Amino acid sequence: NLAVGGTTPSYGVIKEAARYLHEKEISLATMIRPRGGNFVYNDSELRIMEDDILRAAELESDNLVLGLLTEDNHIDIEGIEQLLPSTQDLPLVFHMAFDQIPLANQKEAIDQLVDLGFVRILTHGSSENNDIFENVDHLKELVDYANGRIEIMIGGGVTADNYQELIEKTGAQAAHGTKIC
């Protein structure tokens, strides 16, 4: 459900997407998010996420996309650690929830995500719904700080017409967008 920033797709959607993408030798990253709204989850929602992770792995997802924050918009280390056993060592991507983390704490968050085993962070570079070009300097700062320890994937306003310029200006390794293809 893109209207709320993405939620966990149905069993059937994951199954069909995996079949289709794997035929084309493209990897599948499955969003694990039980609802729209904020990224603060209670115990019941964490159990739902554990089950969804197990189903996504069973259906041959190649990556899992998660975004868990505390009430004060910091990485929910405890919640992530609860989910880790169910991930079965699949590569983990931190959702654009990263943009809700205060700018002053984002470098610490990168370190925490590296320590938790995440391989990629999806970010717009700002919690504001602004033009991504306004965030180029901050995105470059994040890419430089990550220094290859974790991939910074830029998103939110990336198109087929601008992704190459954004990659060049930020140094990001990858871009994400519904308007790239």
Task: Cite the ranges covered by each PLM segment.
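Active-site-adjacent beta->alpha loops and helix N-cap segments on the catalytic face
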Residues: L2-S27, D43-L46, L69-Q88, I101-E108, ...
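Glycine-rich phosphate-binding active-site loops on the catalytic face of alpha/beta enzymes
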Residues: N1-G6, R55-D72, L116-I132, V158, ...
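Glycine-rich nucleotide/cofactor/substrate-binding loop typically near the N-terminus or early
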Residues: S27-Y41
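Structural beta-sheet core signal
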Residues: T30-I32, L66, F94, I154
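Short, structured loop/turn "capping" segments at alpha-beta junctions
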Residues: L90-F94, R120-L122
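Catalytic cores of alpha/beta
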Residues: G37-E58, L92, D99-L116, D137-I154, ...
